[in-house]
């Protein structure tokens, strides 16, 4: 299984003081040595990663670069110019802390944007909710890759197997008894497996990501149809204590098959 390391949260730390430290390019070099892919989300408001980050990483790093972006003309034109290995199209809301759900596949610009990226020999992935309907639509839209949103799975795992329900970070909608949460968790994991199988049957390559960490990743790794995970915040958080290289290697060990 391949590991794409999302380095957005290193950019978050840099932007907190609006200086050039930590150096995102240095982080990209470490990911290039120890991970399989560099993933970077350039948002419409440029709150974290900047255009020059993407340009430098593509120019100086040998690893594949997976650009996450919304259906924004300015950023899509940047992608067409710089030509990352892959563009993963994601939904985006300015007020959100992180990507909250999968992409709406009925967007009028989506088909045209995919065609433009394909014409530039850029692989296209769609970040989607784990639903059979969205997988079938992704195939019709001629995406090569889908990335299944694992946020709900991760939230359920957190509610079941951590103390988050007793903290300020508890999710009100998951304030339920353990038996109910366990049933929902098992159902969501089964749904991820079903969706991954459907994607592979349709000839799509299947990735997964969002909220995955060192404690919840193992059940997802067992879904053999998933070939790649994109993980960011948990690896960067771990790197504060272990260093980025070790944090990546620890995750690589966990996702070995």
Curated annotation (Swiss-Prot):
Biological-process GO terms, alphabetical: pyridoxine biosynthetic process
Compartment(s) of residence: Cytoplasm
Positions marked as site (Transition state stabilizer): 147
Record's catalysed reaction(s): 3-amino-2-oxopropyl phosphate + 1-deoxy-D-xylulose 5-phosphate = pyridoxine 5'-phosphate + phosphate + 2 H2O + H(+)
Record's keyword annotation contains Cytoplasm: yes
Lineage: superkingdom: Bacteria
Alphabetical keyword list: Cytoplasm, Pyridoxine biosynthesis, Transferase
Gene3D superfamilies documented for this protein: Aldolase class I (3.20.20.70)
Gene Ontology terms for molecular function: pyridoxine 5'-phosphate synthase activity
Annotated family: Belongs to the PNP synthase family.
Function summary: Catalyzes the complicated ring closure reaction between the two acyclic compounds 1-deoxy-D-xylulose-5-phosphate (DXP) and 3-amino-2-oxopropyl phosphate (1-amino-acetone-3-phosphate or AAP) to form pyridoxine 5'-phosphate (PNP) and inorganic phosphate.
UniProt-listed PANTHER family: PYRIDOXINE 5'-PHOSPHATE SYNTHASE
Subunit structure: Homooctamer; tetramer of dimers.
Name of the featured protein: Pyridoxine 5'-phosphate synthase
Native species: Campylobacter jejuni (strain RM1221)
């Amino acid at each position: 299984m391949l590991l794409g390391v999302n380095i957005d949260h290193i950019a978050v730390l840099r932007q907190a003081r609006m200086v050039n430290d930590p150096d995102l390019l240095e982080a990209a070099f470490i990911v290039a040595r120890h991970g399989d892919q560099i993933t970077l989300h350039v948002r419409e408001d440029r709150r974290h990663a900047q255009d020059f980050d993407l340009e430098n990483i593509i120019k100086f790093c040998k690893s594949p670069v997976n650009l996450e972006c919304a259906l924004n003309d300015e950023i899509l034109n940047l992608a067409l110019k710089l030509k990352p290995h892959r563009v993963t199209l994601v939904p985006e809301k300015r007020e959100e802390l992180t990507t909250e759900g999968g992409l709406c596949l009925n967007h009028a610009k989506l088909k045209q944007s995919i065609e433009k990226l394909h014409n530039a020999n850029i692989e296209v992935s769609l970040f989607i909710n784990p639903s059979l309907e969205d997988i079938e639509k992704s195939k019709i839209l001629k995406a090569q890759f889908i990335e299944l949103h694992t946020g709900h799975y991760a939230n359920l795992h957190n509610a079941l197997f951590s103390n988050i329900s007793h903290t300020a970070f508890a999710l009100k909608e998951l304030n339920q008894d353990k038996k109910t949460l366990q049933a929902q968790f098992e159902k969501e994991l089964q749904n991820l497996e079903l969706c991954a199988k459907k994607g592979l049957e349709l000839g799509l390559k299947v990735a997964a990501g969002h909220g995955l960490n060192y404690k919840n990743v193992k059940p997802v790794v067992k879904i053999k149809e998933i070939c790649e995970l994109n993980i960011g915040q948990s690896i960067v958080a771990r790197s504060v204590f272990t260093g980025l290289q070790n944090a990546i290697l620890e995750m690589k060990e966990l996702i070995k098959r």
